[in-house]
């Protein structure tokens, strides 16, 4: 992940042109929350961007912290929360670092369209960090683009997007191997997800910390 590239995008590209900036929370998150499968608790949005999903959780009773590597994104997220009259904490942090900026532990973590920005050599460290900030039995929801996704050329594990980012496209087996040592997987499947500029094929993983 190139943090400077992400920050540059938030500083220079209008929010409605950033592909992953969707104001409406994903159906999969909404279902977990509104059916009560995930109960209000301390929650953390990893790679929160403009804070849209963190705000959704706060409206539904969660005590939410949003984290992003981009200071510009965090500034936007804080202003977004003020506009919606909700309380969220937003923190700039390196999710591959020691996470000293993030206080306490959480009962729910999620990253939506973050993991494909993290390349294989850094993923084990990232998942260890997620485990470190969760309580035992906490839920963890992750979604990243699948290697079968037809977008951005439709082939290859590494693909460059029109906005200039390079993403890594995963298989179900890769993610099962990545998460299983630290998490009990409850659901892992390839799904279709909507996007600002078209739908994507993605791998959805719902798990609990061991």
What is each of the regions a protein language model found here?
Residues 132:
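Short, conserved loop/helix-junction motifs that constitute active-site signature segments
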Residues 110:
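A conserved beta-strand element that flanks and buttresses the S-adenosyl-L-methionine
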Residues 1-44, 50-102, 118-129, 139-210:
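Class I (Rossmann-like) S-adenosyl-L-methionine-dependent methyltransferase catalytic domain
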Residues 113-117:
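Short catalytic micro-motifs in class I SAM-dependent methyltransferases
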């Amino acid at each position: 992940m190139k943090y400077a590239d992400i920050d540059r995008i938030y500083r220079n590209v209008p929010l409605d042109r950033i592909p992953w900036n969707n104001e409406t929370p994903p159906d999969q998150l909404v279902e977990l929350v509104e059916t009560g499968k995930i109960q209000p608790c301390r929650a953390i949005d990893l790679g929160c961007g403009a804070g849209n999903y963190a705000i959704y959780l706060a409206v539904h009773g969660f005590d939410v912290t949003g984290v992003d590597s981009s200071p510009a994104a965090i500034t936007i997220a804080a202003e977004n929360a003020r506009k919606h009259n909700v309380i969220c904490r937003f923190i700039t942090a390196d999710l591959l670092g020691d996470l000293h900026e993030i206080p306490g532990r959480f009962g729910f973590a999620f990253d939506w369209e973050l993991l494909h920005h993290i390349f294989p050599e850094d993923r084990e460290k990232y998942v260890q960090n997620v485990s470190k900030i969760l309580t035992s039995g906490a839920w963890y929801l992750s979604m990243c683009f699948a290697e079968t996704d037809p977008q951005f050329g439709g082939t290859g594990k590494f693909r460059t997007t029109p906005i200039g980012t390079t993403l890594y496209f995963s298989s179900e087996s890769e993610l099962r191997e990545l998460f299983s040592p630290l998490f009990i997987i409850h659901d892992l499947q390839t799904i279709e997800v909507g996007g600002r500029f078209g739908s994507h094929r993605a791998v959805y993983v719902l798990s609990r910390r061991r």
